[in-house]
Amino acid sequence: VVLYWRKFFDFKRLEFYFKLIAGVIPALLLGYLFSDKIDELLESPTVVATTMLLGGIVLLFIDKVFKNHTVENDRQLSYGKAITIGIWQTLAMIPGVSRSAASIIGGMQQKLTRSFAAEFSFFLAVPTMMAATGYKLLKAYKETPEIITSKQNLIALGIGNLVAFIVAILAIRFFIGFLQKHGFKLFGYYRIAAGIILLIMIASG
């Protein structure tokens, strides 16, 4: 994680940050336009279970489908590829779809090596999560202004979001490290098993 942060804050590579911004734009647009619909889908355990199952099946074949990777670093990454990866990332707005997996698959589809696709996915998570948190806070403020204006609530929100952000970043880094070493198959089997178990639980009431 420390190594990734050093790369992230290497301000000598300004073009890298512009490419990250380009990659975040699709999520910002779709998140703004369809946030209410996404919240509705989150309330459906059947949608989550189904996407976990179907997504797991897709992951079993990813390493075989996307081959001949030629993009090894951000200097070889075009803005078009960054935006396309960002579009893939928006699939994570569907409940049950992994953001990291979606963006890594998008990277591999755009000829990134699995290692660089994982690295770019990690970097892309930072502005994406910050933007999502900021939007939710703004939405909460519009609905209930006292949430933000109260000092006690503001401190609680700040601590809660900071802890959630740190835990999410660590979890993403672990997940990406796992994918770099083992590929998508094991994660695919896990999602299939979890999806089947959830569907059985839903069916049995």
What are these regions (language model features)?
Residues 1-205:
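Multi-pass membrane proteins that catalyze or facilitate reactions on polyprenyl-/lipid-phosphate substrates
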